[in-house]
Amino acid sequence: MTGGKKFWRSIEEYQRSDGFGEMLKSEFPSIFELWKVDRRELLRVMGASLALAGMTGCKPTRSDEAVPFVNRPESYIKGRTDHYATAVLFDGFAQPVLATCVAGRPIKLDGNPEHPAFRGGSTPFMQAAILDLYDPDRSQEPLAGGNPASWADFDGEMAKWRSEWQRSGGAGLRLLIGPTTSPTMLRQIAELRSALPHARVHLFDPLSGYGGETQQQFRPKLEAAQVVVSLDDDLLGPGAMQAINARAWGDRHGDAPREQRMRLLMAETTPTQTGAKADRRLGIPPSRLAMLAQAIAGGGEVTLTEAELGWAKEARKALQGARGRSLMTVGRFAPPQLHALALQVNQMLGNVGHTCEIAAPLGFVPGPGESFLDLVRDIEARRVSALFVLAPNPVYQAPGDVPFAEICAKVPLRVHAGLHVDETAAVSNWHLPISQSLEDWSDARSPDGLATIIQPVVRPM
């Protein structure tokens, strides 16, 4: 039997020096004498150690009985499924769903076929929203300094602060909220600002794109586009518009004749779902995306590779050949200049109002001095005495150069409201559990601007 390549562990072994063999025998003599086990025994011991380590990480859960009905309705038929129209939230926008319930408990979420924009479209995020409802790690009770407390304790604490806020007009009071399009919440924020004019409501949106919350909203209408040129814009990927865009894409590519199908040209910096569906895909570094857009717009001399130049010429020709029926989009994280250039191209081609529309923001728009960084500066300047964080987790999600856990420790009163005891809750004086969207009455707007009612399908769990 001939052996393969012979490997060596050091220069000494390769040179077969006299001292190398003695060194191997004498390096750990005590271990070799005490631990005389074979490979199988070693693996058995290691497996037992890993199993014990895993058991120590387990914790007992509450033993609750899921009783479907206390008083069963007369019309109830065992095994029958009921369906209720409601909505879940994604990035503050309503995602209309049809909840399937068995014995009074929701078991599945699907797209609502009656919604004019979604038309039954669904996404993995919409269907996975039901997992939050049954999450055993959800917060169940108020916490004061990490210890269980009652709602009466919290009301008593707030009574002391409320009189001070009413006297000072809300000076030092700050609210930090996530993206929201709820008309009811926007009205309540307006009432709070009217009652406490010195209070501030800050927006925390770590995933906001160009212009953030103050930009005019750009809404693509893929159902009307014959040619789409996308610059790192994952139209079919995760986002509030995913179900709407996927439905429009399916309509134009399902049973449609070839001449009526949408043509998609995609330039992307990382592989995406949209790029996988593109008729012509180009991989490009982020630093070269602006030059590619300039070549499409015909704005001056730019230096491109042969592949980039060929793609840009093809995209430019396709856009010009479908005036009023074409669309150029840019990813949400692209620089402002790139968004402005894409908007200019769409206006020159007559696409605005046909394949895309520009509308006012649907969600909460903070006023001057109400950004997240403004809040950080005010806290460091000791101008904040009370901070209420409603749902976001800024300690975990804030930029790396903003140590928010250390910064918010300078605020005397810190209140966090959310589904879980997360990193922000851990540094707060108070943590308050909130209801999941399937347990609560609310409202929100879908990405097309339509107001949507959110109704509970189960009592708070």
Where are these predicted regions, by residue range?
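N-terminal export/assembly segments and adjacent metallocofactor-ligating motifs
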Residues: M1-V302, A307, K313
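Non-catalytic alpha/beta scaffold blocks inside enzyme catalytic domains
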Residues: L192-R193, P197-H198, F204-M461
